[in-house]
Amino acid sequence: MKIATLAVVSAFAATAIAGPIRPDGVVNDKFLIELGPGETQWVTKQQKHEMRAHINSIYKAGQGFVDITDEFGTDFTTAEVVPANYPKSALHAAVVNPMIAGLSKENLMRDLNTLVKFNNRYYESPTGVESATWVFNEVQKIIQASGVKGAKVEKFTNKFKQFSVIATIPGASKNTVIVGAHQDSINLKDPMKGRAPGADDNGSGSVVVLEAFRNVLKSKAIQAANATNTLEFHWYAGEEGGLLGSNNIFKKYKADGRKVKAMLNQDLTGFTKKGNPEQFGLITDNTNAELNEFCKTIVEKYATIKIIEAKCGYACSDHASAHRNGFPSSFIAETNFRNTNPYLHTADDVIANLDFNHMLEHAKVVVGFMGELAMTPNL
């Protein structure tokens, strides 16, 4: 998760440029980042990390970024939003409720305990590759146990070491519904070797998506191949470096003409601040308003806690990759960000700080989102 303040961005204002034009003397240790539509600048990797370090300060809607170095010299343009027709109410409780009944807090605990044992899940470290491999193997086991025909898992490779994981459940149409979470973590003091359990950021979102996937595959409707739309479950590499993995995926989907009708992001799903009401935070900036309304419907139908609107700034997480490539996206987080987890990006982002009941509520929302849209005709 990335929430940097405007003050940090202004510290690098002297190097800002109007567009992606490589200045004289810029070499391979500089990276082109996008701070907003059409607003770019060249920074070092250390500067990228420094921009992120302020996530632990009191939250205010700040300036995230997308690393678009690989887009330099291309004709990238923001695509028109893929049109979609979302239901005004939840219509498939008969499909979704059995999925919810199968959700297991014990599974969430077990899977998260595995993820936090990696020294870190940094996208350029050996253990970052090992953690991605664990996710891939676990998804493969779940598919094999389900017996669902056509379900598959793939590695989406990048120019950096860590790969993303994509699981697909085919539907009758090519219209695609996606839920995603980044599985990388970072210790900002020592990204490559530092301890970064990343329990909340974003082991919590990763295991929520994994548990949702497990129970969607157990659905009788899914096993009978009755889904109207294709479902994908994503675990992204390199979010902490500037949405690297997710942006690579959605750029390819745009180039391939994919019909992604909805994308739900799960980043930070486990922290609740004592003394504050338990709630979801629905991010309203750089997301799709119509899909956000559908998300409210899902929360009201299938979860037991309230949802409030919040903002997180440009490119704060992977939903922004879908959004900038023309795909409708939403982001439901653990809080409104004023009460965000104070331990993010440190060695202290550990399981002891998390609430698995809250994570279970996120899992209910994910299976509600995926189950309802799986069965929606003319999406």
Curated annotation (Swiss-Prot):
Disulfide bonds join 312-316. Belongs to the peptidase M28 family. M28E subfamily. Keywords: Aminopeptidase, Disulfide bond, Glycoprotein, Hydrolase, Metal-binding, Protease, Secreted, Signal, Virulence, Zinc. One of its GO terms (molecular function) is aminopeptidase activity. Probable extracellular aminopeptidase which contributes to pathogenicity. It comes from Arthroderma benhamiae (strain ATCC MYA-4681 / CBS 112371) (Trichophyton mentagrophytes). GO terms for biological process: proteolysis. Its cofactor is Zn(2+). Its main location: secreted. It is found in: Secreted. Its EC number is 3.4.11.-. One of its GO terms (cellular component) is extracellular region. This is Probable leucine aminopeptidase ARB_01443. Binds 2 Zn(2+) ions per subunit. Glycans are attached at residues 202, 226. Zn(2+) 2 binds at residues 201, 240, 345.
